[in-house]
Amino acid sequence: MKPRWPRLLRRVAIAFALISAAASAADAPATSGGHFDLSRPEISRFLDELGAQGMDRAAAAATLAQAEPLPRIIESMSKPAEKTMAWWEYRAHFLTNERIEAGVRLWREHRELLDQVALRWHVEPQYVLAIVGVETYFGRTMGHYRVLDALATLAFDYPPRAEFFRSELAQFLLLTGEEQIDPLTAMGSYAGAMGASQFMPSSYRHFAVNEDASTQRNLWSDWGDIFASTANYLQLHGWRYGEPVLAEAQYSESAELALAASLSLSDTLGAVRARGVHVDSRLPDDTPCLLLGAPLQSGMSYRVGFNNFYVITRYNSSRLYAMAINDLAQALLERIHAQAAP
C-alpha cells in the first residue's frame, strides 16, 4: 500500500509542530539518564532524509531529542523466546489454562463484534484471538517501553538491524502525526511494537483499521479496531477462510522425512505422502505445504503446514510462533464449544 505522501506530509508537518511545542515543556521519564546526541552523523543523516521527504526536520529533531537510549533493549533483542525455548516449552508457556480461559472470556464478551469481523474479513475469530493472546495475553501485557526510546535505540545503537529500525522510526513519526498520538507517551514492546496485536509502525500505518469510524485507529484499547486490524493483516497476506493451518503427520520407518529448511511452501501434500508420511488431512495431493518437526519433552512432533501457516509467519517469521497460534486457536475453539454444550 503506497502512502499518499504530499497530502500526508503536509498534515504530519503541522501535527509535528504542535507535538514538538508541547514536548518542549514535558518531562520525559528518566529511564537511562541521557538522550541521543543529534549531531551524531547517522542521526543527522536520518533527520536530513526526513526533511528531504517533506517532513518538518526541526519538529522531528525536537521529538527525537526526547528519546533515551536503553541498553537493556539491545540485550532483549538477542534472546527472543522463539530462539531460546524448545517447542514444548514455548507451547506450554502460551497454552496455560488461565490464558485459554481469558481468551474464552474475551470471545464471549465480544462475540458479536468478532462475528462481524469474521464476516467482513473472512478470518475465523479463534485465530484473531490467538494472535492477541500470544502477543499480549489478550491486551494485558502490551509493553512497558516508550516506543520512541525503543525504536531510536535500535535505529542508532543496534547495527545488525539499524536500517530496518530507522525505517520503522520514520514510520512511527509519521504515524503519531496522522493518528494524533503523543510520541512521548506511546508505549510498546522492546522492539517498538504497539497495541494489543503488537503492530510495528509500518504495519500500523498500512494495515490498521478504524472499525467504528472514530477519529483514529486505536490498537491499545478499541477492541473493534484491534480485532479488525488483526484480521485485515491476515486477509491481505492471503488468509483462506475455512482452510487448516496445520495437520498432524506420522511416518513409517522407511519414510523420507525431508523437513522443510525454509518457511516457503516448497512441497506438496502428495509428494510428502509419497515419501511414506501419513498426513491427517483431506486436502488434495496438489496442495502446497511444508513438513515440520518440533522437539517434545520426549521424541518429536511432526506436522504439515499449509497456506494459512505461511500467512501467520508473515505476522511473525517463526515456526514456533505459527504453531503456537494454531494450537491456542484450536484450544479456544474447543473450550468455547465445550462450555456451550448442554
Where are these regions (language model features)?
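C-terminal functional modules
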Residues: G293-P342
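Solvent-exposed loop/turn segments at secondary-structure junctions
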Residues: E68-P69, E135-G139, A193, R240, ...
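Bacterial N-terminal signal peptides that target proteins for export
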Residues: K2-A13
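An acidic, Gly/Ser/Thr/Pro-rich helix-cap/linker signature
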Residues: D27-A118
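Acidic/His-rich structured neighborhood in mature extracellular/periplasmic domains
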Residues: E89-S229, Q235
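A contiguous strand-loop segment
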Residues: D37-E42, E49-Q66, A162, R166-M187, ...
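Bacterial N-terminal signal peptides
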Residues: R11-A21
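Flexible, glycine-rich surface segments
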Residues: P183, M187-Q297
